[in-house]
């Protein structure tokens, strides 16, 4: 079942949170000269046209990236991420949104590498064309969860693994935990960043319980809600679960998350939290 297209949702509040966390982790990994791997299990198309039919139909980016990218009081923690957004929108008009692979491409160094996976028959060719001239990148049409077995550990023993499936089938909530556990067995020192949507809170609670049961330590949870939890249809919040986070990440997110919540949610509904699921 491959009906999900991220082009309908690109640049929304969930992308803002996900890509803020992603960019801060990458910047932390760059503090050492040694190369690292960026592995993206569900990479999508790479870039998204915000004036395109899909993005215009939902308008989700108007309540996401459009609310923050030109703010005068932008916190320092957002500079790497917004710098990439600006790179793709140099005329001051918000026309394109870079997905996680393009954010990684802009922030990674020459010595680093990218392993990108996408299974959707429409998105894969778009992703491949974005990276055909980048010799740091390998783009595969494959099952992202299988890559956690096949591509880990990297030779450098350093890396960020981003896992953000569409959750269009309920088994994704279990598959992400199984995938992380398989990856962790092979690469216990890597940083794993798992994105999740809050549609039904009970699903997230179950997923976190299963993650705790793996015995993995150092699990940080970052969540941004735009509305209170609800049993109605639709995403009320999203979060990032980070295993082996860089030591600065907790403080960085505690600093920037209140600003993001205030700017993205003028009505003040929902919440913004940073907490440990499992400490060291």
Predicted regions and their residues:
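Class I S-adenosyl-L-methionine-dependent methyltransferase catalytic core
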Residues: 1-280
């Amino acid at each position: 079942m491959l009906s999900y297209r991220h082009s309908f949702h690109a640049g929304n509040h969930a992308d803002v949170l996900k890509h803020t966390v992603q960019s801060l982790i990458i910047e932390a990994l760059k503090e050492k000269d040694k190369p690292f791997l960026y592995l993206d299990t569900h990479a999508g198309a790479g870039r998204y046209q915000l004036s395109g039919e899909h993005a215009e139909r939902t308008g989700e980016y108007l309540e996401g990236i459009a609310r923050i990218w030109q703010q005068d009081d932008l916190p320092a923690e957002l500079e790497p991420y917004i710098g990439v957004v600006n790179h793709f929108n140099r005329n001051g008009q918000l026309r394109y949104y870079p997905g996680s692979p393009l954010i990684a491409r802009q922030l990674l160094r020459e010595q680093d590498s990218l392993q990108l996976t996408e299974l959707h028959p429409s998105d894969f060719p778009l992703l491949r064309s974005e990276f055909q001239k980048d010799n740091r990148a390998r783009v595969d049409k494959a099952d992202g969860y299988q890559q956690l077995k096949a591509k880990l550990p990297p030779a450098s023993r350093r890396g960020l693994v981003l896992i953000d499936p569409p959750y269009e089938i309920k088994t994704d909530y279990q598959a992400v935990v199984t995938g992380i556990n398989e990856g962790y067995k092979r690469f216990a020192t890597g940083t794993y960043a798992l994105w999740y949507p809050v549609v039904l809170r009970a699903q997230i609670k179950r997923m976190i319980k299963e993650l705790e049961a793996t015995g993995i330590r150092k699990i940080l949870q970052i969540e941004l809600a735009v509305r209170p939890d609800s049993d109605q249809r639709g995403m009320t919040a999203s979060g990032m679960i980070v295993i082996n986070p860089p030591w600065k990440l907790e403080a960085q997110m505690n600093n920037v998350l209140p600003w993001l919540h205030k700017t993205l949610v003028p009505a003040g509904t929902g919440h913004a939290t940073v907490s440990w699921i499992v400490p060291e």
